Amino acid sequence: MRQRFDYPIFSDREIATRHQAVYQLMEQENVDALLIYGAGRYASDVYWLSDWPSSREAYVLFQTGKEPVILLQLFNHFPMAKVMSVIKDVRWAGANTTSSVLDLIRERGLDSKKIGIVGSLPYQVYLRIAEKFPGAALSDLSGKLRMMRTIRSPEEIDRIRFASKLTDESIQALAGGLKAGMREDEIAALIEPAYLKRGGYAGIHFMSSMPMREPDFPVPSQFHSNRKLQKGDALITEISGAYSGYSGQIHRTFSIGEGPTAEWKKMHDAAMEAFEVLSKVIKDGATTTEAEEAAEVIHRRGYSTY
């Protein structure tokens, strides 16, 4: 029988700390409930609160003095949520999700209360709530919840470190397997085994190939072509290996069949200089302005940022 402990989980203490932070936010903002929405890979708020990596649309309702509730789609995703979620009241949202949300608000006696909203709630749902419950006061607390989440816990940092290790291993596999004649769209087969063998998955693997002497695309592309790598090409990459809701990221440029041209080498040296300067500046207490000022080395070397 499947159980929660068969999957990567956060400790009970970690989850309790998160839930307590939500209730403190509700008290601070003077709301009676918090309705959190997420869908697919854009459901990190739901994941953070439930320890279940939501797969389709889902709503989580927190309410002072009552246990939280999850409404989710689809019906065949319901059994997995029941196993993994630390929130025990998990419900299928039925044939009409919006109607189920309205029913939950009514069931919980929130039809004339203050409800905070987190996430990009579909306009149709927001409109129905506002029309059905004109006495309810809705306010957007997305930014405040996410600002609270920006300070990572030790358990979260452990996951980020492991995801970053998977990312490093994938880039090493890429370096060892690239060769002229490969298609762009088959390169992912070099990358993903590093994640999959360790219980991870691909966050992103954006890539663009082009002749070094005639570059024609400014960024790693989100969709891969069937173009074949050739001697004298550059392959620019943006790779993220992920593990249970957290990912690393690495950018690397590869030259195919020969070393980098003088211009590519010069550009790489400028990027390395910027990285080394930034790595010294970015620390506890640093501001984004300070980081941007440190990155000005790119402009001083004659380049622009895209």
Regions found by a protein language model. Give the residues of each.
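Active-site neighborhoods and metal-handling regions in enzymes and metal-associated proteins
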Residues: 1-306
